[in-house]
Amino acid sequence: MFPTRLDSSLAYDIAKAMMDGFNRHYRLFRTESARAKHRFETADWHGQQRAQRDRIEFYDLRVRECFMRLAREFKADEQPMEVWQQVKLHYIGLLVDHHQPELAETFFNSVTTKILHHSYFQNDFIFVRPAVSTEYIENDESETSPTYRSYYPTHDSLAEVLVQMVLDFDLRCPFADLDSDAARVQAAMVEQLGEVKLRANFQLQVLSGLFFRNKGCYIVGKLINGFNEFPFALPVLYGRAGQLVIDAVLFGEDDLLMLFSFARAYFMVDMEIPSAYVQYLRSMMPRKPRNEIYNALGLAKQGKTLFYRDFLHHQRHSTDKFRIAPGIKGMVMLVFDLPSFPYVFKVIKDFYPPPKDTTREQIKAKYLLVKQHDRVGRMADTLEYSEVGFPRARFDDELIAELEKFAPSQLEISDRDGDGRIEVIIKHVYIERRMIPLNIYLQEAFDAGGANPDDTSPAALRAREQIERGVIEYGNALKDLVAANIFPGDMLWKNFGITRHGKVVFYDYDEIEYITDCNFRKVPQARNEEDEMSGEVWYRVGPKDVFPETFAPFLLGNPFVREVFMKHHAELLDAAFWQSHKERIQAGHVYDVFPYDQGKRFHPEISDAQVPSSI
């Protein structure tokens, strides 16, 4: 029975303690994000990387602190459900005029679900649905720190206004030639506008927070004229002389989607009202789910919450069944999907055939490494869930048999909540964006005649371009991973996927290593004919030894694939290439990475990146 009166002072005290816990969390999160500006101004790239890793751990630490306080001060796990119903209602009252209500609701869920039995995970006790609207919260924000600022240039004053817009961010380091950069941005904006009349509402809007990631920061906003809006971003980098430059102007949803890709590290942004940032960014990228925008802003737990709500909504409005995912089955992961839903679900198997030598804990550690690392646009982000329930009726019997065979410890089939509905409960699962596996992408092109030089049909020519594009992108992905100090371990085509933007992304993490932990060697010269003809490895191989020249037999069996690979990426088969980058990283060098095409850059001369394309 839902309470008609709030008469429990204990319930209020518990709610207040949880609100205090959330406010402490967001204060620390925001402080660390705001410090990114100083780290950028002092070119403290290693500090930026450390802060990125540390900030990811903040949420779980604060949840644990709050849970322990509730147990210690209020014996929270011993309180009756009547009290817990009132706790939620008091908490809702505390959210009135709060600037991060959606994050605070999620924090409440994270703490409460550590205390209550799963049968109480319903809207009476936790926030299954949001209770407080996030619309127009920014109407109450300080005039001195709005979510976004507006500028009203004329055709003649656009460059001058752009200069002022950049200076208003108060970066404490000089620009090499801001006037020249502003003139380039102006020219690009005029080209975007085309031959149109400037309307009464012609304006520039920019979000007040700078977006920091890697060695760059980004000014993000819109150019508005009449009924047209042009999303844009301005990357700000260090030039050769240690002075700042605007390196490009990115326009339109596709460029912004690349910048905010799920395969990139999270931004650091100082935000008073994160929902206002998400709403603004969503207006620029309407195809991007809100959960992925929260993730990109470093608010991963909110991203998980919204993803799960979207997933439940999709299940309610679809009828297809979960199935074993298409493609070559993995030795470590059992992968399944729902055809109508653009994600895959990955469960760690209970056992791994030779030559795999790993454990569940080691695999989880690899996935955590990727979560905390700079993914440079080449490693897919993952969402990690525990005790996830699916309707049994929606599971293909073949998939159930596969789970029972390879991951029985991770599977429970029961009426967990006692409501008469049988569920498939997965103890631990990773969820990733679905991509086309690169081996399937290439095979489709082979089947269309792309590797046959005698086939000159239009379909074969398109297929040949597909092969070339896939192989070049694969090599670029490997080089980008090198720049991020990542060695994939298993480099087979099947462990990489193609995104909707045509980028190759790595997604199989159980064998990854830091480049700096590997020893890259040439295969020794055979001592005699017997060694040369031997099918066995006759030389000593250490546990972290890598022989790049041995990649070729596994990757380059097709002559056309080999031709393209050797033309663009032959150095990947040379141990000296890998070893030289290892030594630079060990010496403290941090590579430049660019989430946009090299052709868009105003200052290509400042790059030390070894990749001649975007990442």
Swiss-Prot record:
Highest taxon, organism lineage: Bacteria
Give the UniProt keywords, A-Z. ATP-binding, Cytoplasm, Glyoxylate bypass, Hydrolase, Kinase, Nucleotide-binding, Protein phosphatase, Serine/threonine-protein kinase, Transferase, Tricarboxylic acid cycle
Catalyzed reactions? L-seryl-[isocitrate dehydrogenase] + ATP = O-phospho-L-seryl-[isocitrate dehydrogenase] + ADP + H(+)
Q: Which GO terms describe its molecular function?
A: [isocitrate dehydrogenase (NADP+)] kinase activity; AMP binding; ATP binding; phosphoprotein phosphatase activity; protein serine/threonine kinase activity
InterPro entries given for it? AceK_kinase (IPR046855), AceK_regulatory (IPR046854), Isocitrate_DH_AceK (IPR010452)
> Where is this chain's protein located in or outside the cell?
Cytoplasm
An annotated GO cellular component of this protein is: cytoplasm
The record ties this protein, via Pfam families, to: AceK_kinase (PF06315), AceK_regulatory (PF20423)
- Name of the protein in its database record: Isocitrate dehydrogenase kinase/phosphatase
What is the organism of origin for this protein? Albidiferax ferrireducens (strain ATCC BAA-621 / DSM 15236 / T118)
